[in-house]
From Swiss-Prot:
Highest taxon, organism lineage: Bacteria
UniProt-listed InterPro entries: 6-blade_b-propeller_TolB-like, GerMN, Lipoprotein_LpqB, Lipoprotein_LpqB_C
Protein keywords: Cell membrane, Lipoprotein, Membrane, Palmitate, Signal
Protein family: Belongs to the LpqB lipoprotein family.
Coiled coil: none
UniProt signal peptide: 1-29
Protein name per Swiss-Prot or TrEMBL: Lipoprotein LpqB
Membrane association type: Lipid-anchor
Positions of the UniProt region annotated as Disordered: 38-63
Record bears the keyword Cytoplasm: no
Record organism: Corynebacterium jeikeium (strain K411)
Cellular compartments per GO CC: plasma membrane
Length: 583
């Protein structure tokens, strides 16, 4: 791989290869990002605009079509929404606050409100809000009705909007061509992994790199602030340019107090953020006029920071739980695992991403459930006991795991990798009060690969929370955000994909499996051909999706464009089993 063409390692995106799926887009875009501020300042997002075309009023245009073009032009935020303001009367152009709340609608329906005349007409605009766009391109998923009026006036023979609500309304379809989701990466609190912070960026800007770096130095979105580190000091600045060879160059000032380790971690942030958004390296990085780190005087490649690769996949053979036993795929057959896992009835199990440590829920029938933890060849250690336990889930590595007891008590299990001794710490779940409904029961709780978030199913609905760290080192759930509006209360299983999206299995025969982005901006139904709901378990290794439906353990090859049906996993034929991959 040449320096000039170095790119980030990319995992296979489920939604890009499933040509047979029905895309149900909750597509969204970014909030208004300043286009005319100095790119050297922390608060800046991009240099001058690229001049991407937006619709303009045409001579003699009918009022309803002009209103529709206004909404399309509203998707172009440059110069204080100059493109959209061309559709307003002169007086309204100065009064409309285009920095007001921005709402994304699933559709925009327009109908006249009473009889109009040659000089005035009022239209009623309706739709469903699928999300709002916050500062820095943060998408906040919602699903509420929207309805309001837009008044129009004929000015010198041309229709213009004379009165409208103080809000920016966008049709989701406009985002397909004008906005793209990008990941800004921040280190976890221990500096061992990069955590994605998904943002929506307007594409009509000259420098994607400048936009990304400005968002990075501005810091993580509010929801992530207690789950990640922000290495850039408040008074620091960053300037983005291209060097003489056309390669990206990022020059920081104000980093004198950062340690060598922190500078290397910041370099990883920048390189993987740019590489993940198709800004090709190599990358020149400097801090206060000197190389970012003393040991790196040349340009940076992703290979130089491979230990922080946010897309790395843990390759392990498929395992499965069936009839209380744990099996491992071994060539053309499934082999029952021996050791302590074979000495009790295993209801569910999780495999750590490293070191092959198992966390298993044991017990059956009316007996209490017991969590047991240990490597395959070791003696296990007993931990949480309750009437019911969710399938356990590991964090970033084998030093911490999580389980939910009796649908409500979330416990973090800490494990000493040397001695194998475990401890238990209660996770503060007081933010669950923000979830609607009574008798809230957590049936699924799965921690992301970077350890910073968890997806959970509460009474059939899908939520994402951050795992915040408190001052005393314990964990606390961040505010739950419902991301699965498309599946309603039909969800029965969920797990993380390698690209950071969430796979969801449901009890709906017409839509048994979904892929949902972590910010709730996009939901996509995956083909259900040859599946029978409910889908009680889901997992993916990037090349195959595994699910347990009403009949068997099934697989779908996402790397093959010829795949049209789910097939039974050959090694587990005749057994109804749940898939197990490394967390």
């Amino acid at each position: 791989m040449s320096n000039k063409t170095t790119e980030a390692t990319k995992t296979t995106k489920v939604k890009k290869v499933l040509s047979v799926v029905a895309g149900l887009g909750l597509l969204a875009g970014c909030s208004t990002l300043p286009d005319d501020t100095n790119p050297e300042a922390i608060s800046s997002y991009a240099p001058a605009p690229s001049g991407q075309e937006a619709p303009t009023p045409t001579d003699g245009q009918p009022s309803d079509l002009l209103l529709r073009d206004f909404f399309t032009a509203s998707a172009h935020p440059l110069r204080d929404h100059q493109a959209a303001k061309k559709f307003l009367t002169g007086g309204m152009q100065g009064r409309w606050q285009s920095d007001a709340p921005t709402m994304v609608l699933d559709r925009i329906d327009i109908s006249s409100e009473g009889p109009g005349n040659d000089s005035k007409i009022t239209y009623r605009v309706r739709g469903n809000i699928v999300g709002t766009l916050g500062v820095g391109g943060v998408f906040d998923p919602q699903y509420t009705a929207f309805e309001t009026s837009y008044e129009m006036q004929n000015v010198d023979g041309q229709w213009r909007i004379s009165n409208l609500p103080n809000v920016v309304v966008l049709d989701r379809q406009d985002f397909v061509s004008t906005y793209r989701a990008r990941n800004i990466y921040f280190p976890d609190l221990n500096g061992r992994a990069l955590v994605s912070d998904r943002r929506w960026i307007y594409t009509g800007q000259q420098s994607t790199a400048a936009s990304l770096v400005s968002l990075l130095v501005a810091g993580p979105q509010d929801r992530l602030k207690k789950a990640v580190r922000n290495l850039v000091p408040e008074d620091a600045t960053a300037q983005v340019s291209n060097d003489g060879g056309g390669d990206p160059a990022v020059h920081f000032t104000g980093l004198q107090e950062l340690s060598a380790d922190a500078r290397r971690l910041l370099a990883a942030q920048v390189v993987w953020t740019l590489a993940g958004s198709e800004v090709r390296g190599p990358y020149e990085l400097t801090a206060d006029g000197t190389p970012m780190t003393d040991d790196m005087h040349g340009k940076w490649l992703v290979q130089d920071l491979s230990q922080y690769d946010p897309n790395v996949q843990v390759q392990t053979p498929l395992r499965a739980v069936s009839g209380g036993d744990v099996y491992q795929q071994d060539g053309a057959r499934a082999k029952k695992l021996e050791g302590w896992l074979s000495q009790q009835y295993v209801e569910s199990v999780a495999l750590s991403p490293r070191d092959e440590v198992y966390a298993a829920v044991t017990g059956r029938g009316d007996a209490p459930r017991q969590l047991m933890i240990g490597a395959k060849g070791d003696q296990p250690v007993s931990s949480v006991q309750a009437n019911s336990l969710t399938r356990p889930t590991w964090g970033l590595d084998a030093t911490s795991a999580y389980v939910v007891a009796d649908g409500e008590r979330i416990t973090e299990i800490t494990r000493n990798p040397e001695s194998g001794i475990v401890g238990e710490r209660k996770v503060d779940s007081s933010t669950m009060a923000m979830v609607d409904g009574k008798d809230k029961r957590i049936s699924v709780f799965r921690v992301s690969h970077d350890g910073a978030r968890a997806v959970m199913i509460v009474n059939g609905r899908v939520y994402v929370v951050t795992l915040d760290t408190t001052d005393d080192g314990t964990k606390r759930l961040g505010a739950p955000v419902e991301i699965g509006h498309a599946v309603g209360d039909t969800a029965v299983s969920a797990d993380w994909s390698d690209d950071g999206s969430v796979l969801v299995g449901t009890r709906a025969n017409d839509a048994p499996v979904w892929d949902i982005e972590v910010d709730g901006s996009y939901s996509q139904q995956i083909t259900g051909r040859n599946l029978s709901a409910p889908v009680v378990s889901v997992a993916t290794d990037g090349s195959k999706i595994y699910v347990t439906d009403a009949n068997a353990l099934m697989q779908f090859d996402v790397t093959s464009e010829e795949s049209r049906f789910w097939r039974e996993v050959p090694t587990m034929q005749g057994k109804r089993a749940t898939p197990v991959l490394a967390d």
